[in-house]
Swiss-Prot record:
Stretches of the chain found on the membrane's Extracellular side: 1-3
Source species: Listeria monocytogenes serovar 1/2a (strain ATCC BAA-679 / EGD-e)
Residue intervals on the Cytoplasmic side: 23-571
Protein name: Septation ring formation regulator EzrA
Coiled coil: 248-298, 326-374, 400-437, 478-529
Keyword tags: Cell cycle, Cell division, Cell membrane, Coiled coil, Membrane, Septation, Transmembrane, Transmembrane helix
Amino acid sequence: MYYMLIGFIIVVIAVIGAGYILKRKHYQRINELEEKKIKLRERPVIDELSKVKKLKLTGQTEALFESWRSSWDEIETRLFPDLEEVLLEAEMNTDRYKFRSATHAENDIEQMLVVIEKQMDQILGGLKELLISEEKNAKESRATKEKFAELRREVLTRGFKLGETLPYIETKLSELSESLNSYDSLTDQGDHLEAREIVIVVQKEMQVIEAQMERIPSLLHETDTILPEEMTKLRAGYEEMVRKGYYLAQMELDKEISRMKNQIDKMKKNVINLDLDEAEQGVEELHNEIDLFYDTLEHEAEARHFVKENHSPTSDKLQRQNAVSDALAEQITEVKQTYHVAEDDLAVYLKTSAKLSEAKENFEQLTALIASGEIAYSAAQDTLKEIDAALITISTEQDKFAEELRSLRKDELEARDDAERMRRAIITLDRKMERERLPGLPEEYLSLREHMGESIDALEKRLEEKPLNMKAVSQDWRIAEEDLTHLTEKAEEMMENVRLVEHVIQYANRYRLRNKELADELVQAENHFYNDYQYKKALEIAVTALEKVETGAFKKVEKAYESKVSVDDIE
């Protein structure tokens, strides 16, 4: 019983302690919210409203002021009283240990303080802007009026430089003057915000007019003086070159100058209408066009020099190439008596001959046009370059064809010499095989030997044809060379096999008396060797038989053969 009482007392003390701590925390938060409320009440909203109220307000400014004052009245008469009630509710809930209700109330207070602070910020910000606007308007209006007066004076003193744009500029200035009068009227009435907007617009308009007054004189100078003078100089240069014999009708300068004059008239209208960007673009484009005409005249002068420098050399090239072509024609006639010339090859010559005739005709026409002054030198230059390029191509193709004709005789002699060489090679090969003392020659080799002779016969027969077809000769020549190579390889292989068979059988004889199977297979190999001359097959049988008795023996025999060591010395 005693311990239960002690436990109960401890629980009571703990509850009271916890309640005290929570109560203290809530009072601390309520005090912080109270301090924030006091700080908001101390903000100088009423003072600022009083300052602005002393100003003479009308229109938009007055409407804004009334909205700010209504907003403050709402704060004073509704929001702050509501805030006080919720603060009181929070204190009461804390005193009664209704901590959850107290927390809700405290959260509501925080939200209400945020709303009040935001509303007060809007009021003070608007009032401050209005006061600054009134002061700034006063300063900027003086500066704006001074700048306007300067523009007026500049128009009076420099108006002659503005030409026909002067009435438009004066109209703009009159409109700005009316705007400034409206500014004064609105300021007197107390509508400072709307007056501020007028000042800003007038400042921007004056900047535009000032920039226009800077650009207009130079644009008028371009359209009235510089561009007309440039066109006059262009025409003078054009006419001087025509007097010197240049053909320039392709430029159609009269038509182009008339068009450019119309462009200048259009640019002047753009300047008068103050479309200065478009006018500047037009001036730049027209200068570029005039520069292009000068480039054309300069190109014609350079082309004339080129034509005078290259006309005679081109004529000489034509004559030389014509002589080469005639000589090639004679060479073709002579060659055709001995050799067959393919139609494709003749077509190449005929094509180059036609190109040469065309180049000659173009040159004659060009010469006539230059003499009569009916062609621009630039066009004449292009034609000369085309003729020169054609002559280079013709020369290359005809030289190549001439070399092919000259090579026919050379190729014929080489083919005849090679046919003789191949016959000697066969005789040499036959003698070599005789020295080997072969048991005989297999049918396969004899067939190749016969075919080789037929290939040389075909080549020699082809070389006796009239006219001689060197393409066919080359084909037969190639076949004969391939056959000789094949025959030589077969002969070398056959002689190699014979030597190896002899070495293998000689080495295998050491086992012959002791091994009947080996002896029988060696007899079989010898039959192929001596009777049907199948030396490769004889080698295969002998090697297989020997390897059954002594593995690796063939490698030893082969090595001894390559080293020219006697079989008897192989261990």
